[in-house]
């Protein structure tokens, strides 16, 4: 895109959101995948012992960020959308376990989690700065811990995989 702009003067706006979450997310993404594996009784595979960090951003906040960029952003700019909520994958999975069912509360991690997978080259962390977007008046409205119970309930109640 940047090459096309330099060569042909094609205008652009690039958005770079972090990991989105919400109801209707693709089944192979972390939150629905964990719910799927719990529903079918499979161990949950976590790369690199679940230590990598991820920034989470609700899809509603992503949509509002893009609307803000369309209405107030500048052409030929790049906007990061982060949401500024970050945690380890293992911590996300533990929160889902706590919400999913009481039967997992007293389970040992080794009974539920497969922490043996080493993924060479996996990003340990990728954080982005969305100061430019915030300067347009955008801020997150959704809180990960507040939204997660409804999302887990949706996947649990609508298990069709």
What do the predicted segments below correspond to?
Residues 1-13, 38-40:
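Active-site Tyr-X1-5-Lys
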Residues 12-14, 45-46:
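Conserved active-site beta-strand element of glycosyltransferases/polysaccharide synthases
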Residues 13-30:
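Flexible, glycine-rich beta-alpha linker
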Residues 1, 34, 133-134:
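Structural element of the ATP-grasp superfamily
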Residues 2, 32, 94, 98:
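Active-site phosphate/pyrophosphate- and oxyanion-stabilizing loops and adjacent acidic/basic residues
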Residues 1-4, 28-30, 80:
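Short, charge-rich amphipathic segments
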Residues 38-161:
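C-terminal substrate-binding subdomain of Rossmann-fold SDR/epimerase-dehydratase oxidoreductases
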Residues 31-32, 63:
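Conserved terminal C-lobe alpha helix of the protein kinase catalytic domain
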């Amino acid at each position: 895109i940047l090459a096309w702009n330099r060569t042909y003067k094609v205008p652009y706006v690039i958005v770079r959101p972090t990991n989105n979450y919400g109801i209707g997310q693709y089944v192979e993404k972390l939150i629905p995948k964990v719910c799927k594996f719990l529903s079918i009784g499979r161990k949950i595979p976590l790369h690199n012992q679940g230590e990598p960090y991820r920034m989470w951003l609700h899809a509603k906040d992503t949509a509002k960020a893009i609307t803000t960029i369309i209405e107030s952003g500048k052409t030929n700019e790049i906007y990061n959308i982060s949401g500024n909520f970050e945690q380890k994958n293992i911590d996300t999975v533990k929160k889902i376990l706590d919400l999913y069912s009481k039967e997992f509360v007293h389970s040992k991690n080794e009974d539920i989690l497969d922490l043996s997978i080493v993924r060479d080259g996996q990003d340990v962390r990728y954080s982005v700065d969305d100061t430019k977007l915030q300067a347009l008046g955008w801020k997150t409205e959704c809180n990960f811990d507040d939204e997660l119970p409804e999302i887990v309930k949706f996947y649990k109640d609508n298990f069709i995989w």
